[in-house]
């Protein structure tokens, strides 16, 4: 009986130690400029960004363009996002706007592959972590505000 209790205690201790790691947190940043609303969500542990999502909404009329004109401009760019591990991009062309949902899983993506893609800015190199602190500084320089 003592052996069973001891084994259970060791398993519980191992489980608690495993769960006591840095908790994943999120921060959301937004920016609006003519015809475009951007919302970036960062998932991070400590200073390490593990995932980033971006929801971009583009209103055709605000840009003075039609749905077809915007589609013609965005489709070739979206093709560059395809087939890259850790990167997922979806465009939803609606009647009055297009909504882009972009996800970067930094635990799977190779940063060197992401750097050559239009619209993606990364300061880190392969093998390095994407820093939440540096990301925040860059976003603030670009006019993003944190959504609380």
Indicate residue ranges for each PLM-predicted region.
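Subset-of-secretome marker
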Residues: 22-148
